[in-house]
């Protein structure tokens, strides 16, 4: 086989393996509060970060906001700090700056701050109510 064809085959194989590895490995459900407002949050953990959604209980499940984030400190740190951006219909709505240590063997609960688009900051306290391996589904 010619070296050029071999390189292309290896590149495609590497891309396919990388794509498969990047699939969500674990899903989490949280219930708690942002300030005084009850919320339900779902997150899926990837190698490159997390995605999910959140809804305010008073608004109902049909009014979900999209979440996408990444850890912002060194993985060797015993406490992982996450920056999670919240959007609604593709528009920025706010940012979570929280501690969540599920991926380093720590607490699965989320605590920290949420700052909305107007600059108002709220305490975040979320308890993990469900953890599911998405690889097994």
Region locations from a protein language model:
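Bacterial Sec-dependent N-terminal signal peptides
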Residues: 1-27
């Amino acid at each position: 086989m010619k070296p050029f064809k071999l390189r292309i085959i290896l590149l495609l194989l590497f891309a396919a393996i990388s794509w498969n590895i990047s699939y969500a490995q674990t899903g989490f459900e949280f219930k708690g509060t942002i300030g005084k407002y009850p919320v339900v949050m779902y997150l899926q953990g990837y190698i490159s970060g997390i995605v999910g959604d959140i809804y305010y209980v008073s608004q109902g499940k049909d009014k979900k906001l999209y979440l996408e984030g990444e850890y912002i400190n060194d993985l060797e740190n015993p406490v992982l700090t996450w920056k999670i951006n919240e959007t609604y219909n593709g528009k920025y709505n706010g940012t979570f700056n929280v501690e969540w240590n599920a991926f380093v063997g720590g607490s699965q609960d989320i605590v920290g701050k949420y700052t909305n688009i107007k600059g108002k900051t709220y305490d975040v306290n979320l308890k993990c109510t469900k953890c599911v391996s998405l690889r097994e589904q």
